Amino acid sequence: MTVVAQKTALTGCLAPIDKNGLEQLIANGKANPKVVKTLKCKTVAEGKFRHANYIRNLPPYIVDEPPGLLGDDTAPNPSEASLAALGSCLAVGLHANAVHRGWTVSKLELELEGDLNITAVWGTGDVSEKPVGFTDVRVKVDMECEGIAPEEISALVAHVKKWSPVANTYTRPVNLEVGI
């Protein structure tokens, strides 16, 4: 199964981020490079496969499954939400790094797709030995910056991929504890 995240076109100059705030974040990170922040989310089942995810003081972030996976199709499924998190993290990194370099971003779009085998049906179906979860993820970045050559943007994309927290979660082992 291939999951494709829909794209939203943003054209013109992107709303600027606070360059002074960015510089302060950079200084804070350099001053205390070993700091670890714990992020939290509370997931509450609402019925069928629809779940409300409570993060900070924000409205709940809803995750559901499509009808083909017995859901009501009211929101992205968990795998799609994972792609959205990756795309958003990469986009934040691209925008922040462009601003840090003094670039003006006029266009930033990312198209993501990922391949996964869902025959295990969350452990209730075919549980023969095979990879579970995404086996391949592809991200296409369409970024334009005033006066910046495509080669420089490609180098920026590689840099951001290396330093993206969510991309690193995809590409390296993470300690995961699940219990009662």
Predicted regions, residues:
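Extended beta-strand/beta-hairpin segments
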Residues: 1-84, 96-180
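Alpha-helical metal-binding/catalytic segments enriched in His/Glu/Asp
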Residues: 85-90
